[in-house]
Regions:
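A glycine- and small-aliphatic-rich helix-loop capping segment at beta-alpha/alpha-beta transitions
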Residues: 46-57, 80-82, 144-154, 213
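A glycine-rich beta-strand to alpha-helix segment
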Residues: 29-30, 38-39, 43, 119-144
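ATP/nucleoside-binding phosphotransfer catalytic cores, i.e., glycine-rich phosphate-binding loops
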Residues: 186, 190-261
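Class I SAM-dependent methyltransferase SAM-binding "motif I" and its flanking Rossmann-like core
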Residues: 136, 140-185
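A short secondary-structure junction signal
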Residues: 111-113, 140-146, 150-152, 206-210, ...
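N-terminal glycine-/serine-/threonine-rich phosphate-binding loop
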Residues: 1-32, 49
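Ligand-binding beta-strand-loop-alpha-helix segment within the catalytic cores
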Residues: 56-130, 246, 251-260
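Short beta-strand segments
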Residues: 33-37, 65, 102-103, 130-133, ...
Length: 261
């Protein structure tokens, strides 16, 4: 696991966006796994700017969702499909066939979960997966004590996660669904490169447990320690509880440029 400490969210977004752009230059049809929420927006903003400037060709690029609410009406503006289209697909100018996501409105949710795992495998797997992290250490919607070998499945959200997400529903927690389809931790770990971005002091404890604590289901993000190519990008506030912060700064400052993230 590599830990990169950046000054702020904008710097983290630019760093990750350049890694994604480099991936698409090497492999034009690479599959990018995208996360939702406010944290990854600087990544998408920086990536959109690169596309607009002609720094990267995305005509063959593909994206896929990490998760989806269950039971929201089709076209609901806060469904993750609508969010990804709004934040990523449309700004980048991607085509309608570039986007893969689970069906949160399916009558048979279990079948939809299994179908999504098959769709990811049929697409050749995820090349780079963007991740956020919850205040309780969740990734995707794999809440504490999720199996580290779990596959895409339906999960019940914790009340803390519903409280955290109420800001997207007019601060009305009653509008926040109780269930989601999420890639499992085992599914997430199959991506070739995992990049987790965390910003703000509120994420500091979760980051410290993820990076410096033991691998444990109670901190789902700690499973990144088991991945052969995992990168954790944090701003100064989110890094504030890392005991090894000086070491992480030193190693990144002396990393060969050609290695990238």
């Amino acid at each position: 696991m590599e830990v990169v400490i950046v000054p702020d969210a904008k710097a983290g977004g630019e760093l990750i966006a350049e890694s994604i752009a480099a991936l698409w230059r090497r492999k034009p049809d690479a599959l990018l796994g995208v996360a939702t929420g406010s944290t990854p927006i600087p990544i998408y903003d920086a990536l959109t700017a690169k596309v607009a400037a002609g720094d990267v060709d995305v005509s063959s690029a593909r994206v896929c969702q990490l998760d989806e609410y269950v039971g929201l009406p089709a076209g609901h503006p806060e469904s993750y499909r609508a969010t990804v289209i709004r934040q990523v697909v449309e700004p980048l100018g991607l085509g309608p066939d570039s986007f893969i996501g689970p069906d949160g409105s399916a009558e048979d949710v279990q079948a939809a979960c299994e179908a999504y795992d098959l769709a990811l495998a049929s697409a050749g797997g995820v090349d780079l997966q963007i991740l956020g992290i919850g205040t309780d250490g969740h990734i995707g919607f794999n809440e504490p004590c999720s199996s580290l070998a779990s596959r895409t499945r339906i999960k019940t959200l914790t009340e803390q996660t519903r409280v955290d997400n109420a800001r997207f529903f007019d601060d009305d927690i009653d509008q926040v669904p109780h269930h989601v389809i999420t890639q499992g931790i085992g599914t997430i770990l199959e991506a070739r490169h995992l990049v987790l971005l965390a910003t703000g002091e509120g994420k500091a404890e979760a980051v410290a447990q993820t990076v410096e604590g033991p691998v444990a289901a109670v901190v789902p993000a700690s499973a990144l320690q088991l991945h052969q190519h995992a990168t954790v990008v944090v701003d100064e506030a989110a890094a504030s509880k890392l005991k090894l912060a000086p070491y992480f700064r030193h190693t990144f400052a002396n990393k060969p440029v050609w290695q990238g993230l």
